[in-house]
Regions:
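Conserved phosphate-binding catalytic cores of ATP/NTP-utilizing and phosphoryl-transfer enzymes
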Residues: 102, 106-129
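Conserved small/polar residues in nucleotide/adenosyl-binding loops
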Residues: 145-154
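Short glycine-aspartate micro-motif
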Residues: 3-5, 73-75, 85, 128-132
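Short Gly/Thr/Asp-enriched flexible loops that form oxyanion-binding sites at enzyme active sites
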Residues: 76-100
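N-terminal beta-alpha supersecondary unit
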Residues: 2-70, 76-80, 109, 113
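Short beta-strand scaffold segments in enzyme catalytic cores
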Residues: 13-18, 130, 138-142
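Flexible, glycine/proline-enriched loop segments at strand-loop-helix junctions
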Residues: 82-84, 102, 128, 147-148
Length: 155
């Protein structure tokens, strides 16, 4: 089972392919850090335009020699994040999902961070406590199950 993940919530365009048996088998990231540096922070309109111009290249780099038709489902960041940037990722994911006739899974950016340890440490037992620091979001949370059952203890 292969999942293609798309992340465009702020200033990085990232795509990875995750295989349930092999782990990450393809990935590519395009960073906008240098582009925004002269402004002292992320400019949302510039971020959106850059996602638009780079997302196909990032997909091709992530796929490398993995056939697009071998992808079983597509996950994408649905928020929180910059609205325009999120819409680029969602629209791209919807187009691929429709073209390939495969499921589309919206993923909350923060929940993605909370559950990411499970990719590396599959033996991790629930519940577990997470410290999350991501952009403007910081929190301590308890993750109870894989089914979006998280409790924020502090933020």
């Amino acid at each position: 089972m292969k999942t293609l993940g798309i992340e465009t919530s702020c200033d990085e365009t990232a795509i990875a392919i995750y295989d349930c048996e092999e782990g990450i088998i393809g990935e590519s990231i395009h960073s906008q850090i240098e582009m925004h540096a002269e402004y002292g922070g992320v400019v949302p309109e510039l971020a959106s335009r850059d996602h638009c111009s780079k997302i196909v290249e990032v997909l091709n780099n992530a796929l490398d020699d993995i056939p697009l038709e071998s992808i079983d489902k597509i996950a994408y960041t649905s928020g929180p994040g910059l609205l325009g940037a999120l819409l680029i990722g969602e629209s791209f994911a919807q187009g691929l999902s429709t073209a390939l006739n495969i499921p589309l899974i919206p993923v909350n950016h923060l929940e993605g961070h909370l559950m990411s340890p499970m990719m590396e440490f599959s033996e991790l037992q629930m519940p577990f406590i997470c410290l999350l620091v991501s952009g403007g979001h910081s929190m301590i949370a308890v993750s109870y199950t894989h089914l979006r059952a998280h409790e924020t203890m502090a933020h």
